[in-house]
């Protein structure tokens, strides 16, 4: 739940190092899990927030940076995180490690307010639920 609040603050009042540090502090150690959302079963983070994939990402490469990454928060992996099964990591342009599912980087949507929300599905016809 803290991630959307931090993202909203960063979008409204600035960006830069403070926001980067705040978002990095919310890194996830374990792989995402599946859960029911408002639009069906999807992968979720540790807080139960719906995860999404971006059509414009390449295999093993995020193309959502700068302002895009304020609205679509990369699911950052903790330095101790271990990949397993279909879950892996990509290295973002800023050097941080991001969780990926079947090679596709994973994100949360800043406008989802509570676990189970799935308001990002279909945004600009390029954002979709990350389905297990």
Q: What do the predicted segments below correspond to?
A:
Residues 1-5:
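Positively charged n-region of N-terminal signal peptides that target proteins for export
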